[in-house]
Amino acid sequence: MKIIIGILLVFFVTFSVGTAFGHGAGIEASPLIFTNDREVKVTVELLPADFYKSDQKMIKIDAYDHTNRETITNASFKVQIFNDNQLLLDEWFYTQDGNLILEVDPDVIVTNRNTIEISGEKNSFGLWEKTDTTPLIVTGPIFDEGGIYTFKIILDAQDEV
């Protein structure tokens, strides 16, 4: 029998980016959050290890169910990114396999120098979703300078147990 479990979690992750604050890369995870008889952890990782100096920046976000020892699939993530308390990004994303990968290119200006934009496709629910042919790319002035970056992640998952 299939049971659909809905999970809604919120957590904050803070990264320091820039030479004044260290290497500017890393991985941060929420504490274990207990919901629906499950222990869930959400992780945000900045890739590669030399994220701030790299021309190929990526953000990887996933949710892991420690109870079942599996990545949570069919996950929607509301991703908010702040730099020194200024909101830079506030969007919903969907990933079927549970691993959200955002490519980041702060040097590309699509329509406005001061605007952060997303290239990719939206699904029928209006959520950004990577496809086989279209990656999700965040462009504009994000991670283009040092400072304290805070991620606020809301997880809304409909996985099968």
What kind of feature is each model-predicted range?
Residues 1-24, 61:
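Secretory targeting signatures
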Residues 21-161:
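N-terminal soluble domains immediately following signal/targeting peptides that reside
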